[in-house]
Amino acid sequence: LIKIANLPFVDQIKPVVGYTRTSSLEYSDIDPSSRDFDYGNALEQIEQINVRELHEQGYTGNGVRILVMDTGFSLTHNSLLGINVIEQWDVLKNDQETADETEQEVAVNQDYHGTAVLSTIASNAPGEFMGVAFNAEFLLAKTEDVAQEVQLEEDNYVAGLEWGEENGADVVSTSLGYLDWYEYSDMDGNTAVTTIGVDIAASLGVVCVTAAGNSGSSSWYYIIAPADADSVISVGAVDDNDIIATFSSHGPTSDGRIKPEVCARGRQTWCVNPNSNTNYSRLSGTSLACPLVAGAAALIIQARPDWSAMEVREAMMMSASNADNPDNTYGYG
């Protein structure tokens, strides 16, 4: 290790630590019989963030490219069959298959989380379920191993970001976060590998949206990396009455900045049931709130293609319900 560390192109060597991951989602299977308008079950969560008005003006994500990085993606559900997937990359195996490939992956539901997340942006099943940016183009990157959490996954995350930027991503949605090898003092916007990565991506013009984290009722309490980045849109979770979910992580960052930036439905959020090709479910977590906001960002980009990533971020914050009095629970609303 000493010899490697002394090589001129090596900046630093860090130990790899890990722990077994537990699911951050609460599951409740629902029969798809409850429908309302063309949005189906998605109506309330779409109206809650004022997306319906944008759709009615013709902004549905057309021509905007969204990178979704997660645990993997199954595209066999009826509402996902026709979505416009441009490229896929399994960073773990370095191939182009992001759905479950092995018996082990099937056993642990590897692509479950990513499929649910993707569906809230991309689904296109009028009368049943519609995503926020259903006409967008999608890049899908599988960066996470659900069986464990290791620091290598931050490198996978950054590799996915680089791949997405090289392939023309306008928006990145990442319902992922890292804290187990960090202290709260590291949530300063300049320390975590993924935090640095999203700031670089934003500087290159990519609107970066990430989940704030589900630590609000734990001893950690605060947002997790990369939600501490100063250029990211971190997203907290609220219920259908706009009340913050108890699990939603809070700010501030360790250097005093307000977090999260905004909130969306993350309590009993409608999505596809990843274990079915026809049914829908309600899941809870900032993981579900994040893609709703990422989809909204794509609509803004379609409407204002000349805006920078930071201008899109500012527009979302300044037009949110709490913009006049932002705090470390709801952010700007």
Predicted regions and their residues:
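Subtilisin-like serine protease catalytic core
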Residues: A42, E53-E153, N167-D170, S203-G205, ...
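Short, small-residue alpha-helix embedded
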Residues: A289-P305
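Alpha-helical segment proximal to the catalytic Tyr-Lys
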Residues: V235
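Autoinhibitory propeptides
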Residues: L1-I46, R52-H55, D230
